[in-house]
Amino acid sequence: MPAAALLDDFLAFTLAGDAPAERDGACAGGAVRWQWLGDGLLAFEPAATDAAARASVLVSAGVHGDETAPIELLSMLARDLVAGALPLACRLLVVLGNVPAMRAGERYLDDDLNRLFSGRHAQVPASREAPRAAQLEAAASAFFGAAPAGSARWHIDMHTAIRASVFEQFALLPHTGTPPTRAMVEWLGDARIAAVLLHTAKGNTYSHFTAEHCGALACTLELGKVRPFGQNDLTRFAPADRAVRKLVSGGRAEGGATLPRVFTVIDQITKQSDALELFVAADVANFTAFTRGTVLAQDGDYRYTVKHDEERIVFPNPTVKPGLRAGLLVVDTTRDTLAALV
């Protein structure tokens, strides 16, 4: 397949399962070099040689194959870079995550890809997602491993959620053992992200892998509801899209943006068995608040009761496999977190 098809429509090319006749070249009138690294992996770099202070930015979507809006936004970003409509001021790796699931219109085929990073894919060798997790780890490691010493490293992993949310667009920051950075929180404010969830334990997500193993400022963005390809109102994603484009092009963030509210994970509901009962409505919104003493779950001898004056539930899902998380409980820590930004 001619490389022009890849560069004109990265999404359509990837869904078709083709490989380009040429795997690298120049675009944007010679100002940008591109390289196809494999299915759903497209790297860009300015042709100019002043690389010493150049940031390295990984932007991903489609880690869940049915989360189409961010995939469409990322394909448009690549198209505009190729055409020279968007200047490039960084090393950039564009990643479409779970390509087989995208083609099938499914969240995943065998296992949730966003639970298979940091080597966990080795525990499920028969899973059709396992090789992709290993490939994405290797691509991120190689990309950030080639970054100029001391330069900024970013990973923005874009998703949409299965359920509604009290805060329509929110972010999750992986646990790294250090406080969130002011750079990340201010960027999230510029993206008009209303809330940030801070993890307090290591995980197996893509953004956790790049934060821990690649030294990236990493976040997972939840940008709205899951919809089929072509049925998204992309205007609802405009603030986040603008912020990503500014990060890629070296543009300045708007001053005075409201910083997001911050919530910290204080517990989780773990599914012990198929007898798990979640005492919340099937369509309960993420970040719905519950008061002290409310029983939220029961599974045999296990019971989860709200311990703080107010706790909010995020990602409740009783249909996960036993042993996996069936919900997170968070509390508001905005004041303390923003005061401790570094």
Curated annotation (Swiss-Prot):
<dbReference type="InterPro" id="IPR050178">
    <property type="entry name" value="AspA/AstE_fam"/>
</dbReference>
<protein>
    <recommendedName>
        <fullName>Succinylglutamate desuccinylase</fullName>
        <ecNumber>3.5.1.96</ecNumber>
    </recommendedName>
</protein>
<dbReference type="GO" id="GO:0019545">
    <property type="term" value="P:arginine catabolic process to succinate"/>
</dbReference>
<dbReference type="InterPro" id="IPR007036">
    <property type="entry name" value="Aste_AspA_hybrid_dom"/>
</dbReference>
<feature type="binding site">
    <location>
        <position position="159"/>
    </location>
    <ligand>
        <name>Zn(2+)</name>
    </ligand>
</feature>
<comment type="similarity">
    <text>Belongs to the AspA/AstE family. Succinylglutamate desuccinylase subfamily.</text>
</comment>
<comment type="pathway">
    <text>Amino-acid degradation; L-arginine degradation via AST pathway; L-glutamate and succinate from L-arginine: step 5/5.</text>
</comment>
<dbReference type="GO" id="GO:0016788">
    <property type="term" value="F:hydrolase activity, acting on ester bonds"/>
</dbReference>
<comment type="function">
    <text>Transforms N(2)-succinylglutamate into succinate and glutamate.</text>
</comment>
<dbReference type="Pfam" id="PF04952">
    <property type="entry name" value="AstE_AspA_hybrid"/>
</dbReference>
<dbReference type="InterPro" id="IPR016681">
    <property type="entry name" value="SuccinylGlu_desuccinylase"/>
</dbReference>
<keyword id="KW-0479">Metal-binding</keyword>
<dbReference type="InterPro" id="IPR055438">
    <property type="entry name" value="AstE_AspA_cat"/>
</dbReference>
<dbReference type="GO" id="GO:0009017">
    <property type="term" value="F:succinylglutamate desuccinylase activity"/>
</dbReference>
<keyword id="KW-0862">Zinc</keyword>
<feature type="active site">
    <location>
        <position position="222"/>
    </location>
</feature>
<dbReference type="Pfam" id="PF24827">
    <property type="entry name" value="AstE_AspA_cat"/>
</dbReference>
<dbReference type="GO" id="GO:0008270">
    <property type="term" value="F:zinc ion binding"/>
</dbReference>
<dbReference type="GO" id="GO:0019544">
    <property type="term" value="P:arginine catabolic process to glutamate"/>
</dbReference>
<keyword id="KW-0056">Arginine metabolism</keyword>
<keyword id="KW-0378">Hydrolase</keyword>
<feature type="binding site">
    <location>
        <position position="64"/>
    </location>
    <ligand>
        <name>Zn(2+)</name>
    </ligand>
</feature>
<feature type="binding site">
    <location>
        <position position="67"/>
    </location>
    <ligand>
        <name>Zn(2+)</name>
    </ligand>
</feature>
